[in-house]
Amino acid sequence: MPALRVTDLVKTYGDKRAVDGLSLLVPAGSMYGLVGPNGAGKTTTLSMATGLLRPDAGTVEVLGHDVWSDPVAAKALIGVLPDGLHVFDRLSGRELIRYVALLRGLDRRVADTRAEELLSALGLADDAELLVCDYSAGMTKKIGLACALVHAPRLLILDEPFEAVDPVSGDMIRQILNAFVASGGTVLLSSHVMEIVEALCDSLAIVLHGRVLAAGTLDDVRQGDSLTDRFLDVVGARHLEAESLAWLHSS
């Protein structure tokens, strides 16, 4: 059984079809990358996959549970780090993780223990009492990841988890995600950085205009090229015309 099965998803905003019949199969136990240029439909797809946004058509199943007809069972299995994360930022980092853990039904003692372990692992222990509204963008990203992990989900869906994160924290996040997959979990993550996806993911899909243009194992998609070269080939690289922005060179 796949960890995530997305079938014929459609989402339209006015006369723009952001997601256009997109289907995706994420194998259980995989580290799966979702890549595409800005406006390709990645965030909209992930929002529908997690139940944050209702599709106009199509279905989403998490380990056999339909996200829309069986939302309680499906969402209990998912940990989510959405794009443009909005949290209760008048709580401290420690309070926020505990709060999310209690919402997820964890015992208070377990919630406290896991909060401390996550704060330590993500390098936030020294700032645990600081209000989240005073966190940097990278710290906010890390506290969001802690909240996604606290209930030990079976599927993590992460939108740009490495954005605004420093190299040391990024390396720790990679270690956490690798350990999560090694223990039987599944990760679906989006990123604009091909090098991150190439180093971390075993499978991926390239999305453009709300459609999957290529999908499979990393080697299948790359076809012997680097992922960056293959990505540019699939989506169509743009080249700056010689006369463009000529005024920049006039001084």
Question: Which residues are covered by each model-predicted region?
Answer:
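Conserved catalytic motifs of ABC-family nucleotide-binding domains
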Residues: 152
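Conserved ABC ATPase "signature" region
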Residues: 98, 102, 109-127
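ABC ATPase "signature
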Residues: 215-216
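Helical segment within the ABC ATPase nucleotide-binding domain
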Residues: 170-183
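A short, surface-exposed alpha-helical micro-motif characterized by mixed small hydrophobic
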Residues: 197-199
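Catalytic Walker B motif of ABC-type/P-loop ATPase nucleotide-binding domains
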Residues: 156-160
